Amino acid sequence: MRRFHIAVAALLSLSLAACQKARTFQAVPDDMDLGNKDAKVTVVEYASVGCPICARWQKEVYPAFKSKYIDSGKVHYVFREMLVGDRTEVTVAAAGFLMARCAGKDKYFAVNDAVFASHPGLYDAPKETLLNIAKQVGMTEDQFNKCVQDEKQMNALNARVERNAKEHEVDATPTFEINGKKMEAGYHSLEQIDAAITAASSD
């Protein structure tokens, strides 16, 4: 797992060559979510698109999780942004999240999925990789550059990350919260998540 850091609230240069206590789920206006909002179970994932372990989970577990729980309407899935790892990982993740927000809510998860899918090669040419993803969702290079250098949006991202870390006591990724009850931070198999969802459903 990767430990939490707050990104420097400054313009990104994009020289990018240089991741228990139960509480009631409460939505916030900037949440990004999928699935049935009225589902009995809400799964919140705290993750970073720059986190290698998060990317591994996204590739190996998320497709089956999405099919079984999100697409079926059994779970309300919420993704909350974190910035973790070393300076490069934080910078790349911040750019990825800013780009996903700029692409629009309807493309947010497509952008995140593409960034996760680009691991591990993402760090070989991060700027080029992210720009290519931006173009795939209809952004021009100029729009991409303006997006990832938007100080107001960078500050908003930092505020979301800090809120997630402090209010929800998250300091590592990935962290999963099932109906307000956090699982131990780190990679979890579908079977482990199945068990947590089953337990939450019976409460």
Residue ranges and their predicted role:
Residues R2-D86, N158-E167, A199-D203:
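Extracytoplasmic thiol/disulfide redox context detector
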Residues R2-H5, K21-A22, S48, Y62, ...:
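C-terminal cap of thioredoxin/glutaredoxin-like
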Residues A9, V44, P120, A134, ...:
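Short, flexible active-site loop motifs that bind/organize anionic cofactors or intermediates
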Residues D31, V84, S118, N145, ...:
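Conserved short-loop catalytic and cofactor-binding motifs
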Residues N36, E45, T91, Q136-G138:
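Short hydrophobic/aromatic segments of transmembrane alpha-helices and their interfaces
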Residues D38, M99, S189:
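Short, flexible micro-motifs
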Residues A39-T42, G73, A95, V137, ...:
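Envelope-exposed proteins and targeting segments
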Residues V49, A55-K135:
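Structural alpha/beta surface segment adjacent to cysteine/selenocysteine redox centers
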